[in-house]
Swiss-Prot record:
GO terms of molecular function: metal ion binding; toxin activity
Tissue: Expressed by the venom gland.
Assigned keywords, A-Z: Blood coagulation cascade inhibiting toxin, Calcium, Disulfide bond, Hemostasis impairing toxin, Metal-binding, Secreted, Signal, Toxin
Name of protein: Snaclec coagulation factor IX/factor X-binding protein subunit A
Assembly, per entry: Heterodimer of subunits A and B; disulfide-linked.
Length: 152
């Protein structure tokens, strides 16, 4: 009997270790390639959404999308976890200054290495648009209140 309990415990430890980085995420968060994500149905301005993200977990910010795979993951997270799908979802990027160019950094400080624009405008903040199944970026007025996705 003792041997059975020891073996069962050993298998449990192995199974838990094989689950990967998902075990490192807070409850209610989802993992993708070593990062944790959570979709929030709270309606906030871009700045307020960023503040909420930083209060949720250590190192958290509005999501920074760095690949098409991550874009697909975030789109799926939004559609599966939000009851009411509005037109836009905040992401952690905004235009800085008067030039119609994207700032070279996400709100978490990482460089922009992947872009997926619908079209570039100068409304200063960016979000994902429902019409593109939340896969394309669109400029939105920063004072508009939208749901958002945090990444830690």
């Amino acid at each position: 009997m003792g041997r059975f309990i020891f073996m069962s415990f050993g298998l449990l430890v192995v199974a838990a270790s094989l689950r990967g980085t998902g075990a490192d995420c807070l409850s209610g968060w989802s993992s993708y390639e070593g990062h944790c994500y959570k979709a929030f149905e709270k309606y906030k301005t871009w700045e307020d959404a960023e503040r909420v993200c930083t209060e949720q977990a250590k190192g958290a910010h509005l999501v920074s999308i760095e690949s098409s795979g991550e874009a697909d993951f975030v789109a799926q997270l939004v559609t599966q976890n939000m009851k009411r799908l509005d037109f836009y979802i905040w992401i952690g990027l905004r235009v800085q200054g008067k030039v119609k160019q994207c700032n070279s950094e996400w709100s978490d400080g990482s460089s922009v290495s992947y872009e997926n624009w619908i079209e570039a405008e100068s409304k200063t903040c960016l979000g994902l648009e429902k019409e593109t199944d939340f896969r394309k970026w669109v400029n939105i007025y920063c004072g508009q209140q939208n749901p958002f996705v945090c990444e830690a």
